[in-house]
A protein has these predicted regions:
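Nucleic-acid endo/exonuclease domains
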Residues: 1-136
Length: 136
């Protein structure tokens, strides 16, 4: 019975995870706006729907979740997973692979692609903003 409750709780938790307008994205966008950097959010006209697009400069920005994009495990996504590895390892591997495909597609269209980890944004959002300012 306990296993069922744990699985039900996990399912409930996972169903509430958002793919856009996450807390790190909102923090980052507010910092950009405060610095006078204007952008489009969740720009559907581009491959991969960048979280932030600075269309005037052709800069596509992604805010990558540490878990979902396998931070520190890019070579072996899912290495940190202890349960249900049969699901998570292919899932995280595909996420990393898709990130590379999106980067290549955007580069082919002449866009600069910048990716920021959620933990870097939480640690020092202004450092991330300064990185973008280098290209403006």
């Amino acid at each position: 019975m306990a296993g069922v409750l744990v699985e039900a709780k996990r399912h409930n938790n996972m169903s509430h995870i958002k793919s856009k307008d996450t807390t790190p994205e909102i923090i980052f966008r507010k910092a950009l706006w405060h610095c006078g950097i204007r952008y489009r959010k969740n720009y559907k006209k581009l491959p991969g729907t960048p979280d932030i697009a600075i269309t005037k400069r052709k800069i596509a920005i992604f805010v990558d979740g540490d878990f979902w994009h396998a931070r520190n495990h890019q070579d072996k996504p899912g290495e940190q997973i202890k349960t249900n590895r049969g699901y998570w390892v292919p899932k995280l591997s595909r996420n990393v692979e898709r990130d590379k495909e999106v980067n290549d597609a955007l580069l082919a269209e002449g866009w600069l692609v910048l990716r920021f980890w959620e933990s870097d944004i939480k640690k020092d959002v202004m450092k991330c903003v300064r990185e973008i300012e280098k290209y403006l």
